[in-house]
A protein has these predicted regions:
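TRNA-recognition modules of translation machinery and tRNA-sensing kinases, especially anticodon-binding
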Residues: 2-510
């Protein structure tokens, strides 16, 4: 992708230019084009690709109008700020100082292959954009502060990321089979969610994508939880913590989720005030109409300040943010099972396995790259034993490369240990006889230095810190298990049947 930048700047000085100051400025422009803007540019680069001041500088009393153009080297805005520093030194002898810089116009042109249906970002920085014959021109509205914040560079990278995402294979991740268990004994051909509803084990809750789980379903949840504790958490020495379930923007900004989480989160807003009189008419409206005055409530809330728990591990990281971990405390192994997670699934809701509110045991670990990989391998072995010998599932595992990992350059990062090829996610999938499809019901992710870097976590030895996580979703375990084994506990594997006991039928509806 070829990129060009063009910037028109207005430099305002403390006093009008004298003829001597004008001559000194012109000499400085010539020197900047020959030397200053070439610093750090690799040898052999075409000069047209390097930032330079073009056209004829215009002097208007205490104002200097300049045009900067560049390719990818010493980009136009970088050239501007290099020149600002240099001219301040040069014109000081003429008692001229820069007061401010206005950006008259800024244009970015990107030329290359754009995928069919490519959509230009809609952002307040972009006044106008045009994509014609493989050339995207963006007319920007930016201030000098925006340029110092590298807004043009970030816009270019954003466009490149959108192109990469569209050409990544037409889907969010790449999939490679690792293991398949082969067929196992099945006792069910029906949809387990429908069967649980018919038997009164679960009922739809008032909110979308939400279920009320009766005693029978919870017995199975707790049995799975016991298996996890006895076969995985305990033997691998994970310690329990409680992670927050209300997540502020700061956490998602550092974790990277702020790059794309918006269509899937439940947002959290706060009241503008707790003053009861401010809300009295809202309460009165309900008392009179029996309806909640939602439109008026929208006017009286602030935020959103963040969202409800989406991915369960990011809220852990402020606990170690900015810290240096002692060598002898590593690796750290923790888990959280304290509450629900929430994702807006839109039209993707199905059964208990794809819901907006779900229950998950989140397993998280961090340490050196080698320690992180070793724990992931131990988890893989534990899951394999549980799925094969205890749950007796028909399952398979696959290595996947989520788009966000490829996008952030995490795949193949070696960290000096030759283990970068292990970064990525392994999905575990169970066969669903009633649909003839596979359900992803478990995963293990090695995230490399993504989270430690985002939250500035270091190791005493100076070794790069890595982390991993694994979400154990109770709804998905239940959906996978019942789809194959059915709801009659007499057909269940011995360990599960023993831990569940006889399902409790507490309710009788007339």
């Amino acid at each position: 992708m070829q990129v060009r930048f063009r910037l028109e700047a207005v430099l305002r000085f403390s006093s009008p230019f004298t003829p001597e100051a004008e001559q000194a400025t012109l000499a400085l422009i010539d020197e900047a084009n020959r030397l200053l803007f070439m610093k750090g540019v690799p040898k052999g680069v075409d000069p047209s690709e390097v930032g330079r001041i073009t056209g004829i500088p215009q002097f208007r009393e205490n104002i200097l109008d300049l045009t900067f153009e560049s390719g990818p080297y010493t980009r136009a805005h970088d050239a501007l700020f290099r020149f600002r520093k240099q001219i301040a030194l040069t014109l000081g002898r003429y008692r001229l100082g820069i007061r401010d810089i206005d950006i008259g116009s800024y244009t970015v042109t990107m030329t290359g292959e754009f995928p069919s249906g490519f959509r230009v970002p809609r952002l307040p920085f972009i006044r106008h954009a045009d994509l014609t014959n493989g050339s995207l021109t963006m007319d920007l509205i930016v201030s000098s502060a925006d340029l110092e914040n590298r807004i043009p560079d970030r816009l270019v990278r954003l466009v490149e990321e959108k192109i990469e995402a569209a050409t990544y294979g037409g889907k969010g991740e790449h999939w490679e089979l690792i293991f398949e268990s082969g067929k196992k004994l099945r006792h069910n051909e029906g949809d387990p969610t429908r069967q649980m509803v018919e038997r009164g084990w679960i009922k739809h809750a008032p909110a979308r994508g939400q279920w009320i789980f009766g005693p029978q379903a919870v017995q199975l949840f707790r049995a799975f939880e016991t298996i996890v504790m006895e076969e995985i958490i305990g033997p691998l020495s994970f310690s329990e913590m409680i992670f927050p379930k209300m997540v502020p923007w700061e956490v998602w900004m550092r974790s990277g989720h702020a790059k794309g989480v918006y269509p899937e989160i439940y947002y959290i807003c706060t009241p503008k005030t707790r003053d009861a009189s401010y809300w009295e008419d809202i309460a009165d409206y309900f008392k009179v109409t029996g309806e909640v005055w939602v439109e008026e409530i929208r006017k009286r809330i602030d935020g959103p300040i963040g969202g409800m728990c989406y991915a369960q591990c990011p809220p852990f990281w402020p606990f170690v943010q900015g810290e240096t971990l002692a060598n002898d405390c590593l690796p750290i192994r923790v888990f959280d099972r304290s509450g629900t997670s929430h994702r807006y699934e839109s039209g993707g809701i199905h059964g208990i396995e794809r819901v907006d509110e779900f229950h998950r045991i989140e397993v998280l670990w961090l340490g050196t790259a080698g320690q992180t990989i070793e724990i992931a391998d131990q988890l893989h072995e534990s899951y394999r034993r549980v799925f094969e010998d205890i749950l007796e599932l028909e399952w398979r595992s696959a290595r996947v490369t989520p788009w966000f990992m490829a996008q952030e350059g995490m795949i193949g990062s070696e960290a000096g240990c030759g283990c970068g090829g292990r970064i990525g996610t392994t999905d575990y999938e169970a066969y669903l006889p009633y649909s003839g499809s596979w359900l992803e019901f478990q995963n293990v992710s090695i995230n490399g230095d993504k989270y430690p870097k985002g939250f500035n976590v270091k190791i005493q030895s100076g070794t790069e810190c890595w982390s991993g996580c694994s979400g154990i979703g109770l709804e998905r375990w239940t959906a996978a298990f019942l789809a194959q084994k059915g709801l009659d506990y007499g057909n269940w594997p011995e360990t599960v049947a023993r831990l569940v006991g006889e399902p409790k039928n507490l309710f009788k509806f007339l």
